């Protein structure tokens, strides 16, 4: 993730949060650009990736000159941008009780992302 932010001279902070049912997930908060901290003048935006993905989807450098990833464009426009991750992807492999080797760790579905993961991040934002 760090290299994708560095390519665009953006600064960020990883933010760990724990869900009500014990999963610890790392998401990312865009904090600034080459000019310094971003002045937040607009609403917060939580960007949520698709199935099988992670938050890097919103900071990918697109082909061609002059293209800026959506997350960076929103941040530079004054939004407070948060890149959300869910349990089970590479940024959500921790649990209070279970390890990724335990069958119980993987006993979740998409409903859990909306019932537990997203509300836990919203509490942080």
Task: State where each predicted segment sits.
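Intrinsically disordered, low-complexity regions
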Residues: 2-9, 35, 74, 105
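Short, surface-exposed "cap/lid" segments of acyl-processing enzymes
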Residues: 19, 24-26, 30-99
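An N-terminal hydrophobic leader/cap segment in hydrolases
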Residues: 1-18, 28-30, 40
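Aromatic-acidic/polar surface patches that form glycan- and anion
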Residues: 6, 20, 111-114
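Amphipathic, alpha-helical segments enriched in basic
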Residues: 2-5, 96-100
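Secondary-structure junction/capping motif
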Residues: 1-4, 65-70, 109
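Alpha/beta-hydrolase active-site loop
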Residues: 103-125
């Amino acid at each position: 993730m760090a290299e994708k932010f560095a390519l665009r001279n953006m600064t960020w902070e990883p933010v760990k949060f724990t869900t009500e049912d014990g999963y610890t997930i790392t998401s990312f908060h865009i904090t600034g650009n080459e000019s310094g901290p971003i002045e937040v003048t607009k609403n917060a935006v939580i960007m949520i990736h698709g199935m099988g993905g992670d938050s890097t989807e919103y900071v990918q450098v697109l082909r061609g000159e002059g293209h800026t990833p959506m997350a960076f464009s929103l941040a530079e426009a004054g939004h407070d941008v948060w890149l959300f991750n869910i349990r089970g992807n590479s940024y959500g492999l921790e649990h209070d009780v279970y390890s990724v080797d335990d069958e119980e760790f993987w006993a979740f579905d998409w409903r859990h992302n909306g019932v537990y993961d997203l509300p836990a991040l919203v509490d942080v934002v």
